[in-house]
Amino acid sequence: MCPDQEIQTEEVSARFEEGKNQTIIDRKRGLLWLKYDTWQLSGKWLNWVQSREFSEELNQQKFGGYSDWRLPTVSEAKSLFDKKQQNKDHMGQTISHAAIFEPGFGFLCWTSDVRNKIQAVRFGFRKGLQIFDDIYRTSRGSTRLVRDIEKNDGLL
């Protein structure tokens, strides 16, 4: 391992940590991510509306011990895009995404950012681009749910 790779690995391991109950702790941003995206958890593609409903279902179940899972903002989703790291999407393609997350996720991630009540932003992990898409479009729709870490969680 070259010195640059060692530094990058240390930065990543300082930022992310495996949490309990299928979660990943993001120390840099104060977030708790689900290790699996909605495609991996449900086995089906979801549009934006269904993604929000899915988060509500997990909240009712207190998935991972929490009831405040939500769609990420564009900024939060984009923060997982990292050209220094590699992971595999659902098609087995190598993408620039934090490697601590379980491989096999959807490469397009719905976010909470909306426009005109009919479009939402999807962040693409293959090229690191964001696009507006119809909130009812299901094509390869998935998201990685997230929550803010609270002081009383004892995770930071």
Predicted regions located by residue number:
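Glycine-aromatic-enriched surface loops/turns that form tight recognition elements
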Residues: 1-70, 75-156
